[in-house]
Regions:
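Structured catalytic/nucleic-acid-binding cores of DNA maintenance enzymes
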Residues: 1-365
């Protein structure tokens, strides 16, 4: 399943290539991918057509695109995308038609470009036909922080297709009203004083209603470790189960939970409330580090199901210390001159990977 680094890589790609483009048409190939858009496919098509993609935002594993009305005003709802287990958002730029032969016919390169543009990917579920870049977009953001990415860097004067591809159909697209979600520190004027005034809520503090229950993730500028610590202290659940709870800390899935727990030398079943303040701090630092490192590598691609908007794979799997390494030596133990092989153990209908020496099981009570 795509986790925070993979979704952020897709968000950045959309911000780079698609913002400022108006939606000329919507083609729903498989309505199952719109099951969370309760008014149905016809409403989805009508609501998007004529609006422009304004900003690209993310919280945890959720991505959303704010929209501009024809007059440039911010629309009161956003397009939410959840990639599920196998979802992809792909960008296809329309050939500009400037590369013709002297006789006026198509060149081989242009013909190939047109064929690539017209090709329908396998498992295509929804296609947005986008126009050239206009003047109605506002910059998108990660977790609400400002960004200057615009589609002007990539064939801004030609059309584009934004394709939602999903093999397993666990993901989907839907429209959700925007609601305020002002960080406590901002509301108290401790940071960004005056930014929220006279009832005006900036776009970066608006989230889709369907996403508001999702906790802030470690790459969010307003992520508060103290809030997470308090949630840890209220539960006796194992720490990995808590890390996967998107209402506690978002964006962390099975891969990065195992990687962070390995770095913090914690067993996945250790009750969250038994972590000391220092252990909590070390774990959250490990989570943040592994997410940042994976993001820098373009995410983790074990197969063709995860790619960025241009269809390119990430390569963080080359740097994994725990996940998928059952039977291989623990890197940390090997550096210390010890021999300890990583083990794979069942965990909630999936697997956990750990070092039996570095990450000892908690004592039974």
């Amino acid at each position: 399943m795509p986790e925070l680094p993979e979704v952020e890589t897709v968000r950045a790609g959309i911000a780079d290539h698609s913002l400022g483009r108006s939606v000329r048409a919507v083609r729903v190939v498989d309505a199952r991918s719109l099951r969370r858009n309760l008014p149905g496919p016809a409403h989805f098509e009508a609501a998007l057509t004529g609006r422009a993609l304004r900003g690209a935002y993310r919280r945890g594993k959720y991505l959303w695109l704010t929209l501009s009305e024809a007059d440039g005003a911010l629309a009161d709802e956003a397009l939410v995308v959840h990639l599920g287990m196998s979802g992809q958002l792909l960008v296809r730029d329309e050939p500009d038609g400037d590369v013709g032969s002297e006789s006026g016919g198509e060149s081989g390169n242009e013909s190939e470009a047109r064929a690539s543009f017209d090709e329908q990917p396998r498992h295509l579920r929804v296609a947005l036909e986008l126009g050239p870049v206009g003047a109605t977009s506002a910059a998108g953001a990660t977790g609400g922080a400002a960004s200057t990415n615009r589609a002007s860097t990539n064939r801004a004067s030609t059309g584009q297709r934004l394709l939602f591809v999903d093999q397993r159909i666990f993901g989907g697209m839907f429209l959700s009203p925007l609601v305020p979600d002002v960080p406590a520190a901002v509301a108290a004027n401790k940071v960004a004083p005056g930014e929220v005034a006279a009832g005006e809520v900036p776009e970066r503090f608006l989230v889709p209603e369907a996403v508001k229950h999702i906790a802030r993730d470690p790459l969010d500028e307003f992520f508060d470790p103290a809030v997470v610590r308090r949630k840890f202290l209220r539960t006796s659940s194992g720490i990995k189960k808590v890390l996967l709870d998107q209402s506690v800390i978002s964006g962390v899935g099975n891969i990065y939970a195992d990687e962070a727990l390995w770095r913090a030398r914690l067993h996945y079943a250790k009750p969250a409330r038994t972590l000391s303040a220092a252990q909590t701090r070390e774990l959250l630092e490990a989570v943040t580090q592994v997410l940042r490192e994976s993001l820098a590598a373009g995410g983790t691609s074990f197969d063709a199901l995860y790619v960025n908007v241009l269809g390119e794979s990430g390569y963080f799997e080359r740097s994994l210390n725990a996940y998928g390494r059952a039977g291989e030596p623990c890197h940390r133990c090997a550096e210390a001159g010890r021999t300890s092989l990583m083990v794979r153990e069942p965990f909630q209908n999936r697997s956990s990977y750990r070092c039996p020496h570095c990450q000892r099981a908690p004592r039974s009570r």
